[in-house]
């Protein structure tokens, strides 16, 4: 692949370069030697080219090497060849000269710079694969291909979170899934439950009804099966309800503030939980006789048993939340009065209006939602012997299965979408097929068939596409392809929308939804917030929970509260590798009851026990980036206690390195390394750099070990050891350093030190050999300074 023409700016000063990088309005890249950048451009490593290359070479005072009484200062653009060849460096800082001299080839060293070597992009081959083939963590992706892939040259000292793992990225509620699974692995069940409750106050519910998109982001996909997060969450949710007095407690202090929540569905319940946790008095109004919203009235009991929901709501009552049933906005309630009586109001009335087909004689058709509500209320009336359900979502599946279990002889689902893109959860579709439901994908309703004033069926027409080229819902049909479908009941389940008849003029709406800020759920009316399906349209329970939580946090902050929730991830934290997750294996699966045993009221799926979910937690990879820092200078400068000058600060070299998206440093946008300061080493210090690589020229280190020792009377008086290409950032071997002090170098001491160097190692499945290299280099370095026998 050739490099295309790029815009180029030759900076005349550091200030100009920084300003261009920050304020040009373009994506930029700095270039000096170019040995790293040009390779990534040539190979198409990134999804797009930078808009502007900023050339640093014309800037004065960035080159050169100065040696004085206080030490060495190497300009950022000093080349590695200059460092390796400088006799002053070879005499006083031989470690630095050796490290620079091992980089790549002579031709590259003539161009490559000190700062470039320190600031190079990640060298992992998944990151560097041409044509941007792997969208990994370090590119803003959601997984690390090396953990279960080819990892022979990757970290043997754990991973670092450089972003949210796929499971957490795909969870609308932002639950810290890897963190609570880590607690489970450690046997800390209570801590795991509390981590879930920080982001999801009803895991017993979501563990049953959420589509669990998190599993589609699992790092095990393509290897075996994703971790069964849904089953784990469900079991932990039931554990929380069994000990609700411990996990869902009333607040220790009362704020004196009163909040009204209108709507007792998942968004309203979520807001009520977090607001009550903050110490506010919360009253939840709902138009139905019992709280729960769609959770109670549209999700069948075979998926979400009513006693589970009842225990969840009882737990909120235990916390002090007050529920007022049969109170509806526009009837018993007015927004004006609520604003007068309460400090804040959260509107979460949901979407209860059945969307219409717009066909003649549509009044003869039934509502799928009404069927589910009737069954939830205890009615058991058969809708018909031959039932056609219009719709392809999970609600339509619930309607079809419910009709079948009520005794319908034949139940068929017709939907616009093709089979592979039906909006229902795939597992739900498979269950429908298992229960004898027939599918008619890519068929839409054309007309209602009527005989003697009664429903006789539907005429269906072939749907050729559901969306237009811009992704807007605009079905297209083939009028030449139609079919007649005989049915004595047609139930429409094509989605619901909010009832906005109560909305006052001061609350703006758009496309049938109430308008609220997506960040804090605030409406245009002060003190009034809104969320859930009322604002977003039909969405998942997890998304509604997240909206309720956002609103609660915003309301609390506006009232002067300090409600704080745990983080959804531990980005930038070092993670221990879970070696138990490396072998392939099957996920834990909760058993579905036999077809003959399934009913309208009984739950289909049994819980996993706590032992099973702890075993399932062992399959979690606790995903992080395992790419190593491949700089040869980095471990040498760590040992030499160097400091890095930038345009904004001077910092110890140990603080320079980080694991981030597209970067290996902590440098801010527009911040440029200007020089490296290295103090004079201790008198008589013995320095060395050892490097293992596949080829003696060109290749980056498989392992690099930098050492600096001082001895007095044959005894170590100081020791500094650093490992390169062994971990996501350069690593000081402090255990080795501490052990060596006061000891004489010997075979025995070297052997113990070598073992200490890898004592905390966590090799991956394919790179344990790197530990032998570390051991050998550490041992060799110690024995090299021993006095001859």
Where are these regions (language model features)?
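C-terminal structural segment of proteins
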Residues: 1-175, 630-789
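Glycine-rich dinucleotide-binding loop and its adjacent helix/turn
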Residues: 236-252, 311-331, 354-406, 509-524
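Feature captures the FAD/FMN-dependent oxidoreductase FAD-binding
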Residues: 253, 258-260, 310-359, 447-459, ...
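N-terminal Rossmann-like FAD-binding beta1-loop-alpha1 element of flavoenzymes
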Residues: 257-283, 396-404
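Rossmann-like dinucleotide-binding cores of NAD(P)H-dependent redox enzymes
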Residues: 281-284, 288-318, 323, 400-447, ...
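FAD-site-proximal beta/loop scaffold in flavoenzymes
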Residues: 363-385, 468-538
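A conserved FAD-binding loop/helix module that cradles the flavin
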Residues: 399, 531-562
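Mid-to-C-terminal Rossmann-like scaffold of FAD/NAD(P)H-dependent oxidoreductases
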Residues: 430-434, 443-454, 466, 557-622
């Amino acid at each position: 692949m050739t490099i295309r023409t790029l815009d180029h700016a030759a900076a005349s000063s550091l200030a100009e370069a920084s300003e261009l990088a920050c304020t040009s309005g373009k994506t930029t890249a700095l270039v000096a030697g170019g040995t790293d950048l040009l390779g990534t451009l040539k190979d198409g490593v990134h999804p797009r080219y930078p808009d502007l290359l900023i050339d640093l070479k014309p800037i004065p005072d960035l080159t050169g090497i100065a040696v004085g009484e206080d030490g060495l200062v190497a300009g950022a653009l000093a080349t590695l060849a200059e460092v390796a060849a400088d006799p002053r460096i070879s005499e006083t800082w031989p470690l630095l000269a050796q490290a620079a001299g091992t980089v790549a080839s002579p031709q590259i060293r003539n161009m490559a710079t000190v700062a470039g070597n320190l600031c190079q992009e990640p060298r992992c081959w998944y990151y560097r694969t041409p044509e941007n083939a792997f969208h990994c963590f370090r590119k803003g992706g959601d997984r690390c291909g090396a953990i279960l892939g080819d990892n022979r040259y990757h970290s043997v000292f754990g991973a670092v979170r450089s972003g949210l793992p796929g499971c957490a990225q795909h969870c609308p509620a932002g639950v810290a899934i890897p963190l609570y699974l880590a607690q489970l692995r450690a046997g800390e069940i209570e801590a795991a439950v509390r981590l879930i409750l920080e982001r999801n106050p009803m895991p017993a519910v979501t563990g049953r009804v959420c589509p669990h998109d998190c599993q589609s982001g699992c790092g095990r996909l393509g290897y075996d099966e994703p971790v069964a997060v849904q089953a784990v969450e469900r079991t932990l949710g039931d554990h929380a309800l069994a000990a609700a007095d411990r996990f869902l407690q009333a607040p220790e202090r009362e704020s004196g503030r009163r909040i009204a929540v209108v709507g007792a569905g998942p968004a309203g319940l979520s807001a009520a939980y977090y607001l009550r946790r903050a110490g506010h008095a919360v009253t939840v109004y709902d138009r139905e006789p019992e709280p729960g919203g769609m959770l109670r009235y549209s999700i069948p009991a075979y998926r979400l048993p009513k006693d589970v929901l009842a225990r969840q709501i009882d737990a909120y009552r235990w916390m002090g939340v007050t529920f007022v049933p049969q109170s509806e906005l526009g009837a018993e309630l007015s927004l004006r009065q609520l604003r007068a009586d309460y400090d804040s109001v959260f509107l979460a009335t949901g979407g209860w209006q059945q969307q219409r087909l717009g066909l003649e004689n549509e009044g003869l058709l039934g509502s799928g939602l009404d069927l589910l509500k009737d069954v939830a209320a205890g009615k058991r009336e058969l809708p018909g012997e031959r039932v056609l359900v219009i719709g392809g979502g999970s609600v339509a599946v619930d309607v079809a299965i419910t009709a079948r279990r009520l005794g319908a002889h034949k139940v068929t689902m017709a939907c616009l979408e093709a089979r592979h893109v039906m909006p229902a959860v795939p597992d739900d579709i498979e269950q429908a097929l298992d229960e004898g439901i027939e599918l008619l994908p890519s068929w839409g309703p054309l007309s209602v068939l009527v005989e003697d004033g009664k429903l006789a069926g539907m005429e269906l027409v072939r749907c050729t596409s559901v969306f237009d080229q811009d992704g807007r819902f605009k079905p297209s049909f083939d009028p030449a392809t139609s079919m007649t479908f005989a049915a004595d009941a047609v139930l429409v389940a094509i989605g619901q929308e909010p009832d906005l008849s109560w909305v006052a003029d001061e609350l703006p709406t758009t496309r049938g939804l109430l308008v609220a800020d997506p960040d804090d759920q605030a409406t245009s009316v002060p003190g009034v917030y809104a969320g859930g399906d009322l604002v977003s349209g039909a969405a998942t329970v997890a998304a509604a929970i997240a909206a309720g939580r956002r609103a609660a946090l915003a309301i609390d902050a506006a009232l002067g509260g300090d409600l704080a929730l745990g983080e959804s991830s531990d980005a930038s934290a070092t993670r221990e590798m879970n070696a138990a997750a490396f072998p392939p294996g099957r996920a834990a699966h909760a058993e579905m009851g036999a077809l003959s045993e399934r009913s309208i009221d009984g739950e289909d799926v049994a819980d996993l026990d706590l032992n099973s979910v702890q075993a399932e937690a062992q399959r979690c990879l606790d995903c992080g980036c395992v790419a190593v820092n491949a700089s040869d200078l980095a471990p040498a400068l760590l040992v030499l206690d160097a400091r890095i000058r930038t345009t904004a600060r001077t910092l110890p070299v140990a603080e320079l390195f980080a694991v981030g998206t597209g970067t290996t440093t902590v440098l801010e946008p527009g911040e440029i390394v200007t020089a490296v300061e290295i103090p004079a080493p201790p008198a008589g210090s013995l320095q060395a750099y050892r490097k293992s690589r596949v080829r003696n020229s060109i290749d980056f280190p498989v392992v690099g070990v930098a050492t600096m020792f001082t001895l007095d009377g044959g005894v170590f008086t100081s020791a500094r050891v650093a490992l390169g290409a062994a971990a996501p950032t350069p690593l000081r071997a402090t255990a080795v350093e501490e052990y060596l002090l006061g000891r004489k170098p010997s075979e025995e001491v070297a052997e113990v030190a070598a073992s200490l160097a890898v004592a905390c190692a966590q090799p991956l499945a394919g790179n344990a050999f790197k530990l032998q290299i570390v051991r050998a280099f550490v041992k060799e370095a110690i024995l090299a300074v021993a006095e001859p026998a």
